[in-house]
């Protein structure tokens, strides 16, 4: 059986030679973009994924590949065998998160060709592309310090996510360099969704009503956080300055337009595609960190 063959291969520490495998199998010239089946309709909450998907599609098509969007149950891992063993796809592109760590572990163990958006998990070897989250956190916080803000809050994504931890480290370093100490009342977390931005902003206003700035870990969370600030009678940027993250297409069209850390999401998608195809050809694992930049608009 398939499981018995895998067990024997593992026992003898058999390693798949990716380029050789490509020669021995008929290739589908299709790459799977893996999303979670939390809901069936796309919405504004999917904007980051949609924009990175556009870059992936562009990078694949330039190299004669198609993209297949695969919705999977976040608790299941057998989907990878189904798509790879039947030759439907040649590899996978994933958006990393702690909810997907089982997926990454399973793909590493079956030695499937894949690449992940997000910082690589320590001790695991696989291809990845991520933004420079530490620099992003520093840039955002330094901008708020330089604009004269004293009580700068951090509104993060999930605290267990590596990219959020790196952004927090950048925030903390910038505060320390300015001779300021951390205040736990100025720290709250959402989950990168728009609605969580409003909830976390409300929490911050309750914990630290004197805050005069906030660094928010995504444009989506920032959009709803702006509305929450208005509901509390706070003007942006006069009363509270806001710097967000990603520079998605909506950032320039919010009210007010968001000052944000640009990750160049479409380029990230293109790099994910190109680096995975390079891995399929060479078997060489790459971990790419993309530079980020501060885009100044009207919110800070």
Where are these regions (language model features)?
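N-terminal helix-turn-helix DNA-binding module of bacterial transcription factors
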Residues: 1-29
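Short acidic capping loops at alpha-helix termini that bridge into adjacent secondary structure
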Residues: 151, 182-186, 236-242
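Hinge/beta->alpha junction and helix N-cap segments in small-molecule ligand-binding domains
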Residues: 38-50, 69-77, 129-139, 155-202, ...
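Short gly/ser/thr-rich secondary-structure transition/capping motifs
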Residues: 11-17, 72-77, 226
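Alpha-helical recognition/docking segments in bacterial nutrient-uptake
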Residues: 26-142, 204-206, 210, 220
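Flexible loop/turn connectors
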Residues: 202-300
